[in-house]
Amino acid sequence: MGIPSKPTLDSCRRCALGAKATQGVPGEGPAPARLMLVGEQPGDEEDLAGKPFVGPAGRLLRRALAEAGIDSGAVYITNAVKHFSFELRGKRRMHKTPAQKEIEACGVWLDAEIDGIAPTVIVAMGASALVGVMGQRLKVGEARSMELIHPSGAQVRATYHPSAVLRAIDEPRKAELYAALVSDLRAAFEAAGKAELPAMTLALHAARLTPTP
């Protein structure tokens, strides 16, 4: 199938979100990439811009990446759900956690991205991202210490979504979550550099690079 294009996501109606959102928001970054970050869904600013992580959570994520010593341009960044899930409150579009069926509907696009990006490590940021990547709902705090493997062979690391840092109840908790995010990103980056590409991934990319007779 290949990495889904923006026109493909714009026209997607696998769930009801595609008809409500402004546009689909594809992932962004190099292909292949050893490290892939998966968030929950586009926010209001991402929905309008058509790009992932351009709002407050995105700015915090890029600061965390820099602090972890990671070049954001070398990382593929995407979301488990490709359209903005929201509810209207007056004139404001407020974030609404995507339903299980919406995450599952977008699974075909996330699987295609993982196939095309061929990461050695996938970082699932938040519970919804874990559902998208692993197909099961896990508590982030517990999953951070788990050794998870995606069916592609890629390692899966769990961490907090940047928006969870921004929503922290007080400054000490915000500092705690931010430090955990930076630490998890650094550990994932180091693991991605050490890990061997999964045999299945190598075979797939070799097949793509082989000229057709």
PLM region descriptions:
Residues 1-213:
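A polyanion-binding, active-site-adjacent surface
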